[in-house]
Amino acid sequence: MGQELSQHERYVEQLKQALKTRGVKVKYADLLKFFDFVKDTCPWFPQEGTIDIKRWRRVGDCFQDYYNTFGPEKVPVTAFSYWNLIKELIDKKEVNPQVMAAVAQTEEILKTSSHTELTTKPSQNPDLDLISLDSDDEGAKGSSLKDKNLSCTKKPKRFPVLLTAQTSADPEDPNPSEVDWDGLEDEAAKYHNPDWPPFLTRPPPYNKATPSAPTVMAVVNPKEELKEKIAQLEEQIKLEELHQALISKLQKLKTGNETVTSPETAGGFSRTPHWPGQHIPKGKCCASREKEEQTPKDIFPVTETVDGQGQAWRHHNGFDFTVIKELKTAASQYGATAPYTLAIVESVADNWLTPTDWNTLVRAVLSGGDHLLWKSEFFENCRETAKRNQQAGNGWDFDMLTGSGNYSSTDAQMQYDPGLFAQIQAAATKAWRKLPVKGDPGASLTGVKQGPDEPFADFVHRLITTAGRIFGSAEAGVDYVKQLAYENANPACQAAIRPYRKKTDLTGYIRLCSDIGPSYQQGLAMAAAFSGQTVKDFLNNKNKEKGGCCFKCGRKGHFAKNCHEHIHNNSETKAPGLCPRCKRGKHWANECKSKTDSQGNPLPPHQGNRTEGPAPGPETSLWGGQLCSSQQKQPISKLTRATPGSAGLDLSSTSHTVLTPEMGPQALSTGIYGPLPPNTFGLILGRSSITIKGLQVYPGVIDNDYTGEIKIMAKAVNNIVTVPQGNRIAQLILLPLIETDNKVQQPYRGQGSFGSSDIYWVQPITCQKPSLTLWLDDKMFTGLIDTGADVTIIKLEDWPPNWPITDTLTNLRGIGQSNNPKQSSKYLTWRDKENNSGLIKPFVIPNLPVNLWGRDLLSQMKIMMCSPSDIVTAQMLAQGYSPGKGLGKNENGILHPIPNQGQFDKKGFGNF
């Protein structure tokens, strides 16, 4: 053993010197490890004693076979690198004398080492010879070495696994020199099956391309060797058959099906293909369906079974009805591109589906229009894939991908390669994701804007969904989506994102705007109203410095107490002129004590600071009242006209006011007091520009003898509206007053409260509750219609459990209060008995006694509630009115009588 290690070390040392002559430096220890690996994979190499390019390539083939069999983890990292270096040495040995000398010396070392190894023990078989052959490149046969002292108990290293120890010679053994080695190798190859699992210790790979006789080895009886190998193969076959039988029995126990066929008679064990790209040998097509012998894996169209001989059989089965039903339900309730629906599609697509299967599935699940859209997108994706396949040269064309032409039959499509099934799956699922969402136009990304009360996360989700339909995937346009997420957001979210716009991503945007909701929007509108700005201007200017102004000179940078430019004039006190208030005497207006002016009109009370006590502040109110009021009482004569041709006098609010749709009509102060000029009355009308901004001004009549403050009745129509101080919002039109001899109930109007206080709604109350039956998504619901609710509310007990609901950020107020109530996740289609329909998104609240139909639904139904008057109805009937028909000659006018009641405490134009 010591001699063998010494020779091995000398061989490695010579090789290191040869590599050094080529300019390659290697470590001695690494070369030792490399040749240890060579001895393990190529036991025949040290025994041959010759190094040439042909034998070294055989070593490379052994390396490659070992790598393919056991994987890269069993092969040293530097094995192939050192093999290439030594190959270059052998190729260049004729050119470099030093390398040639090193190779020759190494061959001598190998021959000596091989001879020493084979002669370590005395021989017990005098007829056994050792055959030593030179390289084929030298063209001469090696001399035979006969030594009667050699022992046959030492096994040769050509087939270390299959050979066993031999203790006695067989008298019938042929002469080793007469053995046909190539013929024996061909016969042994017939017993090899590539589908059998590898042995625990595989024999070293053998390269049949070398036709030469075996190299230096201890010759053994080839018949005994083949007998042992055949016995091992027969035992392997028996074990494999037993394994298949046990699998069949286990399958029978799991499924409880006693009719499962055995591996010898039918398909063997079945498997559902889940690995696209893994090539499996295919055999005949089994077109018949096993209707009563389906296992859980047989619910998918294409399956594959392998029999006991390793032959693969493909089967095609119909879709399981439960899969189609589940996918159809998800597409109908949530939409074809909803996350839940896409999850089911991807689960089905993980299996092998032919183009015909995809077409059948889509036609059964989607509507006719969506099916055509999917088919057009699928064909377009297949064209692109076919072009790439043509460039790659794999032969998978458009007909194969779409199942048309020569591949229109199911039998032809069943034989597709797994990689082709994967391409069909990718094209089909990509086309499914391109389907449009019903009710969402999705024309362009720029049209997706955040609503005033919409959560930012919902807005980003709509943006990403639209981008996915346009770009194919949201990741393709992520930068564009991020830009639009800021630009199309509402002002509140833009203000929150602006400082971190270039410092975070889209996820950071969502985190910054997570707390912005309806309550935040209302507070923001109030803050903007206090500052006298719009919401957008307030958000843009809230971080800017606000410099104070001098009250004396009006310049910034100092206060009035530090102003040096103000010069106090000590001129003599001037005598007062004609009093501008009463126009009766010469005195200061603040000292005027007259009650009426020179024309007899009553004068308003004094304004300004009072004689005693602090000056009262402006009356303020949170909603609809005066914010930052600067109210001053002015007579009608102080009003101005916009132009000489203006018909009315301009009216404006004396304060910044915030109006919301929930507040209804509100009275806005103008600071203008009556009375009107003699023989006139006033008519208040809103300006058209204010109506466009969402503020509705109600018409009103001002009596001639009204001495109170003139107010404007206004209402926010849809959104929160800010009424700035001093902006013209209405006009007062003065009209001539015609006096009549009608009876007068009160002699003087005076400062009576503005507006009418005696109008009320009259409705007969009965024991019957006015209810209405509607169908929401074809499910019947009954609810009240006179509740006064703004939104529709369904009690939780009537809500189907499979209908999705989500939490909301809004609070519902009324008789009680519900914080963060549940709401339907999607819009429901309502339908009445007359087949009128629309969309609503109701709230769901538990423990309600009855469902409530809100104004969001009743406004779509155009329901009108009225209080009929018996007197007026009788008058209309006497004049020829037909109930249920309209007024007028053609009976196409108003269908219901107009309730009316006299107001005897009123006087003036329009009252009777």
UniProtKB/Swiss-Prot annotation:
Record InterPro entries: Aspartic_peptidase_AS, B_retro_matrix, B_retro_matrix_sf, dUTPase-like, dUTPase-like_sf, dUTPase_trimeric, G_patch_dom, Gag_p24_C
Zinc finger (CCHC-type) residue numbers: 548-565
Propeptide residue span(s): 101-162
Pfam families named in the record: dUTPase, G-patch, Gag_p10, Gag_p24, Gag_p24_C, RVP, zf-CCHC_5
Motif (PPXY motif): 203-206
SUPFAM superfamilies noted in UniProt: Acid proteases, dUTPase-like, Retroviral matrix proteins, Retrovirus capsid dimerization domain-like, Retrovirus capsid protein, N-terminal core domain, Retrovirus zinc finger-like domains
Entry EC number(s): 3.6.1.23, 3.4.23.-
Catalytic activity: dUTP + H2O = dUMP + diphosphate + H(+)
Domain Peptidase A2: 781-857
Site (Cleavage): 100-101, 162-163, 217-218, 300-301, 526-527, 760-761, 874-875
Keywords carried by this UniProt record: Aspartyl protease, Capsid protein, Coiled coil, DNA-binding, Hydrolase, Lipoprotein, Magnesium, Metal-binding, Myristate, Nucleotide metabolism, Protease, Repeat, Viral matrix protein, Viral nucleoprotein, Virion, Zinc, Zinc-finger
Gene Ontology MF terms in the entry: aspartic-type endopeptidase activity; DNA binding; dUTP diphosphatase activity; structural constituent of virion; zinc ion binding
Keyword Lipoprotein recorded: yes
Annotated GO biological process: nucleotide metabolic process; proteolysis; viral translational frameshifting
Disordered as annotated region, ranges: 113-149, 258-282, 593-626
GO cellular component: viral nucleocapsid
Function, as annotated: Nucleocapsid protein p14: Nucleocapsid protein.
Name of this chain's protein: Gag-Pro polyprotein
Name of encoding gene: pro
